[in-house]
């Protein structure tokens, strides 16, 4: 029953995926030949380039819990990660302001950063995987944050074309840590920018849901000072979100 067979798999490549328990909405579909489990009813989608995307909460959580058990984090590392999830801006703000330089940071924040950095020596992805993040218009910077949305909340297409010219095909560096999720869930429904991170096998990334302050986010944390390449930018079918595809550099 679990043997792999070659058949055509249709996957959503530009649409928004939202869930409310079992609800699922997908956008435009495109078909690729891919090995998938015969009749296995798996809701993990292999893409043509072999990146895995979860669309089912329970399957995503089971996968994440399995990874977390492998990390063997110390109590100090767990505590620092929990503190981060409680108020990420408290740590990321100073890191961004200092372009990743920890010199001059308050002693307590510097200590937490050291422990979080240490945890990444134990946390990595066992396979290529898709992670999601939702952002507000401020992600696009002062040139676009106040003009990218029309009054009705839809994307201003003329401004979007300028955004693509500015960002598509370019690298972006984040001096703070990057909080992502295993699923594109309802928590992102109100965010106008959704980034789909392609994360390569062996990349530093940690599933920290079991020790997160706010449960249910299925959070995967990426290291500070990560760089990623924005390979594609599309407007979602509902015309209210920009879907960014980005490859995380190792």
UniProtKB/Swiss-Prot annotation:
Any single GO CC term annotated in Swiss-Prot or TrEMBL for this entry: extracellular region
Protein name listed in UniProt: Mono-ADP-ribosyltransferase C3
Subcellular location: Secreted
Ligand binding (NAD(+)): 85, 92, 96, 133-136, 172-174, 188-191, 217-219
MF (Gene Ontology): NAD+-protein mono-ADP-ribosyltransferase activity; nucleotidyltransferase activity
Gene: c3
Catalytic reaction annotation: L-asparaginyl-[protein] + NAD(+) = N(4)-(ADP-D-ribosyl)-L-asparaginyl-[protein] + nicotinamide + H(+)
InterPro entries: ADP-ribosyltransferase (IPR003540), Mono-ADP_RibTrfase_C3/Edin (IPR016678)
Class in the EC hierarchy, top level: transferase
Keywords recorded for this protein, A-Z: Glycosyltransferase, NAD, Nucleotidyltransferase, Secreted, Signal, Transferase
Domain TR mART core: 49-250
Hydrolase recorded as keyword: no
Active-site positions on this chain: 133, 179, 219
Transmembrane intervals: none
Binding partners and assembly: Monomer.
Main location: secreted
